[in-house]
Regions:
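Extracellular or exported targeting regions of proteins
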Residues: 23-186
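Bacterial N-terminal signal peptides that target proteins for export
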Residues: 1-9
Length: 186
């Protein structure tokens, strides 16, 4: 009985997720350079949905961000950020939280560097931001995962005079897709 209930809940949850629109921030690998010393430099881009913005917040703790988890072999000093972003690397990657509890549960391997870029200037809805890079000593391809915190504008309540739109923080998690061009990297 409990197995049937559990399977039913899992199926309904999966259907609900599949039915929801798949529009949200994406972090993608745009280029990989194989360097003369055998290291690999990864270039990332962040793509925002039309309904999302990135806000610096009142402090780093409240600012929107993107974290790429488990970047094995990170070479110190190699990560670069575009203007309006600040880089950090922590053993436990920054993850969106609410009242101290994680909103998403990425696989975060202990003692493995994570790449976190925190926004320091507002980013408009629908933007694509390029210029995130990091170099690794590892030449093998490893599946990646990312999480992000974004700001979404909730619509005003219809019929309520004077009701304005309200910003809402949202958490995202996704697989870092390996682009097809990586098959050619040797």
């Amino acid at each position: 009985m409990l197995k049937t209930l559990g399977a039913s809940l899992l199926l309904v949850s999966g259907l609900a997720i599949a039915a929801a629109p798949a529009v949200a921030l994406q972090t993608v690998v745009t280029q990989v350079d194989k360097n003369a010393n055998g290291s690999m430099t990864y270039h990332f881009a962040v793509k925002l949905d039309q309904g999302e913005t990135l806000s610096p917040g009142e402090s780093k703790a409240t600012a929107d961000f993107v974290t790429v988890y488990n970047f094995y072999g990170l070479i110190d000093g190699s990560p670069k950020s575009p203007g309006g972003w600040e880089f950090s690397s922590e053993e436990f990657g920054r993850t969106p939280t609410l009242n101290g509890y994680p909103l998403v549960l990425p696989l975060d391997v202990p003692n493995t560097p994570n790449l976190t870029w925190t926004v320091t200037k507002p980013v408009a809805a629908g933007a694509q931001i390029d210029g995130f890079t990091a170099t690794t000593r590892v030449s093998a391809m490893v599946p990646g995962e990312y999480a992000a915190q974004v700001t979404r504008q909730l619509p005003a309540i219809q019929g309520a005079q004077g009701a304005a739109t309200k910003p809402s923080k949202q958490a995202l998690i996704g697989a870092l897709p390996t682009p097809s061009f990586l098959a050619d990297v040797k």
